[in-house]
Amino acid sequence: RDLIDESEATLRAASALRQPGHFQLEAAIQSAHCQRAFTGHTPWRAVAALYQALVEHFPSTGAHIGHAVALAETGQVQAGWDRLEALSADAVARHQPYWVARAHLGRRLGRHDEAGQALDRAIGLTEDPRVRAHLLRARAGA
């Protein structure tokens, strides 16, 4: 808790400068996720807005994926799916988080075959044995 409080104070000080950079936006996203430990829920609208700023100013494949998932968590699942679909096939072909996100959003949209294929692809790209085991359990429960 003390480290989170210290991080929050640092983030507030950086925010007061009104010159958000890549790392400040990422830290703000992580801070929003930390709120779940205290409130029991993630402020997904805030997370989506922060990812929107990150995508606008510092676009990356990871930022686009995070934004897509955050949109889905605010109830805009189709919009999130559309963002995933807009990413370059070359950029995501071997990017495991993309395939996990695609599986998650596909399942929420009722695209179960596509979701299963995406999860299989994610499993094939996963090197960490614990993450792989988690994805295999998810696949078995799908």
List each language-model region with its residue ranges.
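TPR/TPR-like (Sel1-like) alpha-helical repeat modules
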Residues: T61, H112-R130
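Structural motif corresponding to the intra-repeat A-B loop/turn of tetratricopeptide repeats
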Residues: F38-H41, T74, L109, A142
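Alpha-helical junction/boundary sensor with strong preference for TPR arrays
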Residues: R18, F58, S88-A91, T126-P129, ...
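Amphipathic helix-loop-helix modules that constitute alpha-helical solenoid scaffolds
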Residues: R1-Q52
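"A position-specific structural signal for the A-helix of alpha-solenoid helical repeats
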Residues: E26, Q30, G66, A70, ...
